[in-house]
């Protein structure tokens, strides 16, 4: 098994230089003669964490986020993401919905799972005072409803998930 950069692993397979290779699910729709796709169930998790504290600067570094500091905003984001759609379109159907960092582990709390509910997400954002502006971005006291999503360089799956998350949340005005 070769653990290489995703593109390098695919190139090694295409050049017949590898018998087995681990690569991104974005390549799962390609059929390569002499190879078959094998899905392996793991506890690998591609999620993100939101800052829970107000924004502050210490030693020149900004911590927290005024928008995501509100628990109802975090709840709205959680129910405003269509995980099934992401699995289908980003992961080519290879994946399971994730709700915490310990899904499928013995100590996982099933109450962490939520249903996709964009209407309830909008209601939570409105109740929290984040109103939709003419430009399609919510604001509260002049502050934009926004946060930064970071992902590892070279991880096309995390990048695609981050972009898809941003597109889904844009529909909610985030």
Regions found by a protein language model. Name each.
Residues 1-90, 106-137, 141-174:
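Extracytoplasmic/periplasmic ligand-capture domains
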Residues 96-103:
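Flexible, glycine-rich active-site loops centered on histidine and acidic residues
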